[in-house]
Amino acid sequence: VSAYSDYFFNLFNSELIVGYIVAMVGMLFASASVLTFTSSSSSLREPAEVEEIAEKATDSKKDGNILTLLLVLNHFTMVVIMSATPLHVQDIGETVELVGVIISYHTLGMFLLSPILGNYVDKYGYKNFTYVGTSILFISCLTTFINSGPLALKIGLYLLGLGWNFNYVAISAAISKFSIKFKTPLNIRSDSYVFLGSFTAHTTLGLSYLVIGYRGLVSVGMLVSIYLFLNLKKLKKLDID
């Protein structure tokens, strides 16, 4: 987008709108694809084979819903703040080139530890890593709330990606184990809800940014972090580790 910013600005009166449109359509397509192309014969769509397992699955349905909610809120918060950052960068008088630098830091945080994080989640449990992830997410939002200048944005967006990564890998692992143990399509539904949440974040971003601004959005991020942290305690009886 940056390389052709003048062209997009003349065409749409905004060089950023193309990126938002691509992301919005992509997330909607991804959500539909997960549901459409998951085979009906997949073991994840099969009903429980043993009555005892079925009863346990029913008892744990609330835990499964909480896991899905945690995953969706974590991703939704990241997408909203990440997507609002280019708007904020323009509002403080910086160029679109800075957006690329900030998003690069953010992407580094999202994926730098991904190759090794999964093994540690399996070893030490998803809950420990989700506690760490929600704490990092809170610190990220607090950083950009206190100071939303270029340097603070680089640090804050890096931490935002890092916290998201911890939470996403850990909660996704828990959902996968839950789906296999209780033979439910929870991971399919969860992925679909994540993509729909991203679609919603992009479609409502303009209005939410206009109403509460960037600091308002990161304030919501802090509240979501606290909510995630507290709801983890409700999963004490979930025996999947």
For each predicted feature, which ranges?
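Pair of pore-lining "gating" transmembrane helices in MFS-fold secondary transporters
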Residues: 61-81, 158
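Structural signature of the two symmetry-related core transmembrane helices
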Residues: 128-143, 222
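Short amphipathic helix-loop junctions that connect adjacent transmembrane helices
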Residues: 83-99
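Paired small-residue
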Residues: 140, 151-159
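Helix-loop-helix hairpin linking two adjacent transmembrane segments in secondary transporters
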Residues: 1-35
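Intracellular juxtamembrane helix-capping segments at the cytosolic ends
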Residues: 166-179
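A late C-terminal transmembrane helix in Major Facilitator Superfamily
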Residues: 182-211
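Helix-to-loop junctions at the C-terminal end of transmembrane segments
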Residues: 6, 113-125, 209
